[in-house]
Amino acid sequence: MTRRKRLSGFAGLALLAFLFAGSASAIGANRQVIGHSVQDRPIVLFTSGSPEASLKVLVVGAIHGDEAAGMRVTRRLLTGPAPRRTELLVVPTINPDGVAAGTRGNAHGVDLNRNFPFRWRPLGGGEYSGASPLSEPESRAAHRLILRERPDVTIWFHQPFGLIDRPQGNPFTARRFSDLIDLPLVRLRGPYPGSASRWQNHHFPQSTAFVVELPEHVNRSLIKQGTAAVQALASELASPALAAGLPR
């Protein structure tokens, strides 16, 4: 195991302990188990704000277990109030087994970000895409959640490139987030078959899903900035004065 995986695993275990301890009641969020991993760890959704809010934002802290810095953003989001006029949905990780082990894939070795039902194809190696689309309990849990909740904006945190992946379609939301977090907006050129965000943008073209690639080394200042960027973006998009003229 590499040093990065060891460190990711140790940090991830600490975050998982916080999340599984039922701490939501102490921070004003509702906690719901939306599924279980291969190794039967709970996949946890925290919600805050009003279900009748004008904007619904989903934040996923980690889908790759060795890219867990986004979970620090989600933890910080959970310690504060939801942005005004926003229902905030937070899933710290859909891959708790990978986070605990410090591995990209789940306990079956499947890259969950190659397991969604959009342009899926069989892949091997480190991007093993599973036996079929949605073959994994973790990706099925995320898929069910998104179909049920239909978020207006979804932010998927990754590492380590230090950029915002410019999504297909209207890039306004991702561009604004790029400005707020001070990371460049770049179109990643790979095909990325079976990716979660591309499935969302294809299936729900009126909403926006985009990837935030945090750098490999993330300090507390960037975590604070990332948290503030999520809150500011949601506040801007939910503002009646702004939202009427802003494409998502």
What is the meaning of each model-derived region?
Residues 2-13:
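Bacterial N-terminal signal peptides that target proteins for export
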Residues 11-22:
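Bacterial N-terminal signal peptides
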Residues 27-39:
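N-terminal cap/lid segment of alpha/beta-hydrolase-fold proteins
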Residues 37-38, 53-60, 67-189, 202, ...:
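Active-site/substrate-binding loop(s) of hydrolase catalytic cores
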Residues 39-47:
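A short loop-to-beta-strand scaffold at the N-terminal edge of the catalytic core in hydrolase folds
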Residues 47-51, 205:
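Active-site beta-strand termini and strand-to-loop segments that position acidic
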Residues 166, 190-248:
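Active-site-adjacent mobile loop/cap segments within catalytic or ligand-binding domains
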